[in-house]
């Protein structure tokens, strides 16, 4: 097997194991720990920590530890969060959420940097276009990574499926579910029936073990990215400490980045809505917590399949077509969620919505990462740090207002932000089409590759 592909697969399966645990836990936080909003507060704190770390940690850690060391260290924060759930309280979930958040931005920045460099290096050796290899590697990664939601949620559904069956709720009590849920209602719903603590411990044990395996896999099998860079480009020059620290903010001199900040912001908002509002106000409220995993499996499976599909299709259609597809799909889902009144006998509809949400989310995950990697190829660490910063802010906002706004208000907010996002993205495409060739920065790649980066992606 090609060495580059092997490294991509190691990263992908390491993230698969790690997010099998974290993805399952995130989907259940708002339902398991609904008392006084502990679950959503923990998630909001988590992404607040990620927002802060995005400002300075990723470039520093990647420069000092390399991509592999950064990934390993950051993964340990995720394992700590799983352990913290064994003793869920304000004194355990909040500190471990902060720890996870501080490691999340470096983790994703290191992953994106690793795949981008690996793709460009392999493309140079194989005589292929760098952007195509980067897109392909991101497609492979997200195919494997997004399936983590399938396994994580399948585990939770099988474990919680041992909970005694819940009675069907009266019609009048279902009126507080869905878009009408304002979280102030005192009506009893299926969300009040929590699984036994023994089942919760069983689930957490499985998740913690999965996270530990992820750390061991990366440590044992992933080739350090600096070794790859030395082989293809020679020894890397030393970067001053403060230059690395400020690189995240210096990138805002590029007007394209200023226009693109809404893309990761919306990505965080829509993911936060699905994992918090949809799972709690629609699924748990109407069907019960044991159905959360099954519904999220549909989302994850669709997301995974579309991720690899988009990685292949984008080289023929261009990214703009995929962005329009994602926007239209999400707008349709939001309007339907505003109008729909969920009932237990609408079982298939719960899966349709989660599946369509995955179709659109795959666009944001694959194309956003590839777009940042291509447009800011010479400032990858800082660009991806900025991406995670704004995505984290989206999560913080989504979880932060979760306990204070009605679901229908949150849907209107999503619609508004998505509209602004597409306008800003369209402006970036206009800028790119009018400036097919840009001046070379010191140390930039050859002109042919630069032209491809600016005109094709």
From Swiss-Prot:
Keyword set includes Cell membrane: yes
UniProt entry keywords in alphabetical sequence: Cell membrane, Glycoprotein, Membrane, Transmembrane, Transmembrane helix
Subcellular location: Cell membrane
TM spans (from-to): 8-28, 42-62, 65-85, 86-106, 140-160, 202-222, 257-277, 291-311, 320-340, 344-364, 395-415
Assigned GO CC terms: membrane; plasma membrane
Glycan attachment positions: 190
Main location as per UniProt: membrane
Listed SUPFAM superfamilies: MFS general substrate transporter
One Pfam family recorded for the sequence: UNC-93
Tissue specificity statement from the Swiss-Prot or TrEMBL entry: Expressed in testis, small intestine, spleen, prostate and ovary.
Signal peptide extent: none
Membrane topology: Multi-pass membrane protein
Note: Although UNC93A gene is located in a region of the genome frequently associated with ovarian cancer, no evidence have been found for a tumor suppressor function.
Entry similarity comment: Belongs to the unc-93 family.
Protein's name in the database: Protein unc-93 homolog A
Organism: Homo sapiens
């Amino acid at each position: 097997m090609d060495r580059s592909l092997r490294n991509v697969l190691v990263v992908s399966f390491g993230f698969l194991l790690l997010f099998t645990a974290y993805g399952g836990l995130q989907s259940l936080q708002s339902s398991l720990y609904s008392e006084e909003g502990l679950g959503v507060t923990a998630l909001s704190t988590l992404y607040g920590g990620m927002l802060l770390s995005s400002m300075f940690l990723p470039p520093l850690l990647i420069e000092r530890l390399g991509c592999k060391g950064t990934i390993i260290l950051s993964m340990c924060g995720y394992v700590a969060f799983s352990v913290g759930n064994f003793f869920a309280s304000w004194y355990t979930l909040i500190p471990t959420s902060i720890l996870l958040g501080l490691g999340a931005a470096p983790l994703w920045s290191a992953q994106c940097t690793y795949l981008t460099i690996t793709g460009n290096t392999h493309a140079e050796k194989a005589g292929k276009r760098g952007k195509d290899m980067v897109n392909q590697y991101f497609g492979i990664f997200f195919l494997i990574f997004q399936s983590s939601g399938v396994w994580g949620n399948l585990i939770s559904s099988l474990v919680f499926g041992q909970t005694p069956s819940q009675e069907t709720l009266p019609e009048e009590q279902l009126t507080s579910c869905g878009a009408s849920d304002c979280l102030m209602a005192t009506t009893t719903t299926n969300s009040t029936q929590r699984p036994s603590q023994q089942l919760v411990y069983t689930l957490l044990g499985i998740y913690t073990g999965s996270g530990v395996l992820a750390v061991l896999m990366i440590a044992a099998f992933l080739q350090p990215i600096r070794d790859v860079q030395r082989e293809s480009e020679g020894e890397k020059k030393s970067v001053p400490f403060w230059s690395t620290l400020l690189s995240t903010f210096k990138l805002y001199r590029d007007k394209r980045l200023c226009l693109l900040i809404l893309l990761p912001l919306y990505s965080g908002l829509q993911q936060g809505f699905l994992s918090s509002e949809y799972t709690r106000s629609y699924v748990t409220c109407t069907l019960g917590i044991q159905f959360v995993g099954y519904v999220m499996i549909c989302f994850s499976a669709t997301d995974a399949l579309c991720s690899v599909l988009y990685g292949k299709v984008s080289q023929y259609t261009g990214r703009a077509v995929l962005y329009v597809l994602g926007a239209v799909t999400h707008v349709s889902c939001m309007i339907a969620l505003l109008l729909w009144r969920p009932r237990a006998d609408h079982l298939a509809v719960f899966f349709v919505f989660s599946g369509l949400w995955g179709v659109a989310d795959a666009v944001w995950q694959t194309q956003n990462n590839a777009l940042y990697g291509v447009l800011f190829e010479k400032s990858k660490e800082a660009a991806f740090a900025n991406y995670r910063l704004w995505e984290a802010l989206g999560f913080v906002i989504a979880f932060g207002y979760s306990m204070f706004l009605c679901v229908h208000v949150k849907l209107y907010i999503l619609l508004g932000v998505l509209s602004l996002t597409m306008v800003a993205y369209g402006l970036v495409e206009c800028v790119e089409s009018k400036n097919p060739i840009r001046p070379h920065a010191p140390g930039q790649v050859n002109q042919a590759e630069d032209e491809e980066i600016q005109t094709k992606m």
